[in-house]
Amino acid sequence: MRVALAQMLILDPKIMLMDEPFSALDIQTRQLMENELLQLWEADKKSVLFITHDLEEAISLSDRVIVLAAGPGTHPIGEFIIDLPRPRDVAEIRMTPRFLQLHEQIWSAMKEEVLKGYQQTKNKLVV
């Protein structure tokens, strides 16, 4: 993962697209890489489009979270400003009252879509 990140940074893109970059990592390595990404962002302040299914990761790394609807005809169903202070440490920020408040707020908006997606998958397996 570090090599892929370094290769992307060599190209000096204006926008970094990161689609589930840490999903295959164990939780400890994931948190180290998330903190490394935050440090890189602090240095250059480049725009990052980060795609993840991990709500905690989205809140920890973002300034804004956009929740999409489940299914092939996806569309935004919610937008949330993440007003957590920077610099951030992902392990520490997740224990703060504001983080927990944001988590609850976003989860409330997306819970129905998660259940809908789960039901769609479940129905495909039964048929």
Feature names for model-found ranges:
Residues K45-I51:
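Conserved H-loop
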Residues M16-D19:
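Catalytic Walker B motif of ABC-type/P-loop ATPase nucleotide-binding domains
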